[in-house]
Amino acid sequence: SPGPDRLERWHAKWASKQTRWHLQQEHPLLVRYRADLFGPQPRHDSPSAKATRSNVLFPLCGASVDLAALALRGYRVVGVEGVEAAVDALLETFGDEVEQAPPSVSGSLRLRTAVAPGEAGSDAPAVLRAVEGDFLHLSPSAADALGLPRFDAAFDRGALVAVLPEDREAYVATLAGLMAPEGRVLLVTVEHDGFAGPPYEVREADVRELFSPAFAVRPLQREDRMGAEPHWRERGCTRFEEAAYLLTRHRAG
C-alpha cells in the first residue's frame, strides 16, 4: 500500500493525541535483554566505552523515551518515524535540534538531529538522529545518501505489530537491508484475539516465516498481559500475550 495511506491513521492519532502506546519509562524488555542485544558493554566511563557503543536503529519509533535513554548513554541512535509531529516531540524532548546545512534528504526522507549534554564526566554531547519519512522507503541506497551506517542493533517494539499485514514482508526486507552482518534485533510482538489490530497479532510461526531467511530467530520470553493491561479486555480480548525474540542477521553469503 502507498506510503500516505499507510501513515494516514498514525497522523490522525497524533493529531488527536491518541498515543497511549507510549511508555513513560524505558521499556522493561529493553532493560532486561540489553546484554543480549548489545553484548557485554564496558563501563560508561571507561576510555573504550564510546568507541564500542552500538549503532542502534528504532524503526517506527514515535516519540519513545527509549531512544533518548540510549543516546544519553553514548549509543549512536537513529529513529525512523513517518509522522512529523512525533519526530518534533522526540527531538524537542531530547535537546536542541541542529539545523542541517544543506538539509540531509533522500527523496521523501529527511534526517534530523538533536543534541543534549552528554553523560556526566564527558565533554562530548549526546546526539539523537531521526529520519522523518516512510520506513519502507529507507532502502540501503537511501540510508547511504543520508550518511547512515549499517546497524549493529535494533529495537522493534510497536513497529512490526503496527504494520499492515500485507506490508510485513516489505518491512522485514527493509529492516534486513539496514542491519550489519550479525546485527541483532530485539523484537517485541503481541498475540491476542478479540480485534484485528493494531497492534496486530504476530505469532511465533509468523516471526519465523518472516525473519528466518535473513535472521536466526531465538525466542526469549512470553508474558500474559491481561492482568497488567485490563483495557485489552475492553477491546474484546480473552487473551493478550507479549512475546520477545532475539533476531541475529545472517552473515552475507
Show the residue positions of the predicted features:
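Generic beta-sheet signal
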Residues: 54-56, 152
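Class I SAM-dependent methyltransferase "Motif I" SAM/SAH-binding loop
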Residues: 57-62, 159
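A short SAM/SAH-binding and catalytic strip from SAM-dependent methyltransferases
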Residues: 136, 151-167
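Class I (Rossmann-like) S-adenosyl-L-methionine-dependent methyltransferase catalytic domain
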Residues: 2-48, 54, 63-67, 73, ...
